[in-house]
Amino acid sequence: MDIQWYQPTATSHSYEPFADLVMDEYSRLLPAPNRFPSSADGKGFAPLAEYVHSLGLKFGIHIMRGIPRQAVFMNAKIKDSKYTARQVAQYNNICYWNPDMYGTDTNCPGAADYYNSIFELYASWGVDFVKVDDICRNYNNEGEIKLIRNAIDNCGRDMVLSLSPGPARIEQAEFLKENANMWRITDDFWDKWELLYDMFTRAETWCNHAGAGHWPDCDMLPIGPINQDYSKDNRSAFTHDEQQTMMSLWCMVRSPLIIGGEMNGFDDFTMSLLTNEELLNIERDTHCAHMVTRKVVDGNEQIIWLAPAKDASVNYVALFNAGESVCDITVDIARLGIKPTNAYDIWNFTTEAVGDKLTATVNPHGVRLFKLL
């Protein structure tokens, strides 16, 4: 459930400053019943979460860090606390793009009481995933991240904690691994080649920090219909080659795969990006992925990544062409210290014998992705 589910008059992607939000007596935002009828009479998202769970899926919500400004103006109570919203709020700590919240004064015990109370509420609804926004790229938000982590740990329900937006700082890597499950390594990612090209550098920076329970997040996959009206004509501006490059890189880095398009409008090609089992095996079953080489050859930038399977049974190699023309890319397999006999082309579903070297013709902005057997 994305941003501002508590705002009854929301009609677009624009925010309405200082709108009347749906909130309980304890400063906790609630779903707007006019938009989510099942939430009426204090039920919150519990009925919707129950339905989602009945489908075999997990239920997640988006929240902004901090305490509602509306609660501060009202000096509302905080559940199980002697402190009020005004005592918890940090008035000079605000989000520059969303008007709903004040940051909290983490030196005030009431801030912990507030975060404990909202995650207690989310646990009662059956929430499995929480994306906390306006918290990841700010240098000074470690205190609130710790309060959120503690609140989740004490709420009685397992929840995935995702921090946004990026770019997160590599200097915070160990802190983020200890306190979050996902964190954005980039600002909002859209269907522009320059953003995808930049991701190669970000991926190299963060790849060593992906592991069980903690994942650098390259952001959503802008595939299929992605504009605000989700018209089938407003499809991703990425070429097919660029979309395969994106999927290959995200899986090599083992970034969370978050669909950013309207699924009802997906065509066969878009579905093929998400249902390629060998590709998804890279996401699930590899570790220690890393860039092998990055160099310019005859005017085309060539980037090679390697990802070994956790059980060392196979290796995956990605040959990326970041240039503007078709080129041949060669990887010296012998120098990688592995001895495969066959290479399975994951996007083209073909197998070829392989020796000490593997050469593939790669389209501009494209990739050839191989499973080495």
What do these predicted regions represent?
Residues A334-F349:
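Solvent-exposed beta-hairpin/edge-strand motifs
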Residues M1-Q4, H62-I67, V132-C136, L161-P167, ...:
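Active-site-proximal beta-strand/loop segments in catalytic clefts of secreted hydrolases
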Residues Q244, W250-V253, I258-G260, V297-G337, ...:
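Carbohydrate-binding surface patches
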Residues L121-P167:
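Extracytoplasmic, non-cytosolic globular domains
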